Amino acid sequence: MNEGYIIAGLLLLTAGMIDFLWTTLWLESGAGPITRCLSAWLWKGCRKISGDHAKVLSMAGPLLLCLTLVIWISLFWSGWVLIYSSDPHSLMETQSKEPASWSDRIYFSGYVMFTLGNGDLAPNGGLWKLVTIIETAQGLLTITFSVTYLISVLSAVNQKRSFAQSVLSLGHDGTEIVHNAWNGKDFHDIDFLLVAASSELGKLTAQHNAFPILHFYHSTQHQESSIIAVAVLDEALTIFKYGIPEQYQPNQLHIKEARSSIKNYLDTVHTAYIHPAEQAPPEPDISKLQQSGIPALSKQTFQIAVNSIKERRQLLLGIIQAGARKWPVQEQAIGNAYSPK
């Protein structure tokens, strides 16, 4: 018996199983080490090759998901082939009674792992029958968890885009959302929407923590970009909290809840792969609100308050840049003044 083949096979199986279980079951820890390295390498490669072209980047997520599954299968399959190859007589042809060749072992390991079943090759002896049973169980586990993981990721991608659409339908930047929320007396019309956005963002944060691959699902449509939506929502909340007189602001608890949800999102994404930008993004222009007759604090007072949350806004810009996006006010024309309602 060749012990080198056994050791190499067990190492491949162990590496694959650790990454597989880490990624699919250990939801608190995100992706496994192999998947994490593959994700970073693939995303950087796509950005470099495409020049941040949205159409090319939109393929990074699906490609990464497929490559992850292929790597898991390859590690498991190769590991079992090496284990069977440690003994030349581990598998026998049922008709000729001859030992299986390398190609036969590859074939046998594949159909046993995918639980297909066949009769032209058979394990030779009790030990190899037990090994075959273990491989079948591992294959069934892999298929079941992989399908569940695939469905969960695709469902999370849809929810991610739904969140972006619900936020960006209110406005393309924070100032526009604040303007649209004014009912002529105060901003309480947006209270319910803040509660809904906080709830959706909380779910999205949990999904990003469980499935870091979501970071690399890039939408070609501005309206479906969750990182843009988070930045726009946070800018709107910044204006509500620091740029609007308190008597006109939305419900304070709703503002606090929404800002807390965004902070949790930032902490989750920051832990994964994001670093703050070197400079803070441009400040929201609240002078447009004043021009529309909406009560707002002085620009100087607002600037002082915004400077106090500089690190938070730098992290937001870092997320935008890492996602191959531009800060919202740079993507949307905001030069035109909003007309009063």
UniProtKB/Swiss-Prot annotation:
Pfam families: Ion_trans_2. Its main location: membrane. It is a multi-pass membrane protein. It comes from the Bacteria. This is Uncharacterized membrane protein YdjJ. The keyword Manganese does not apply. It is found in: Cell membrane. The chain crosses the membrane at residues 6-26, 63-83, 137-157. One of its GO terms (cellular component) is plasma membrane. Keywords: Cell membrane, Membrane, Transmembrane, Transmembrane helix.
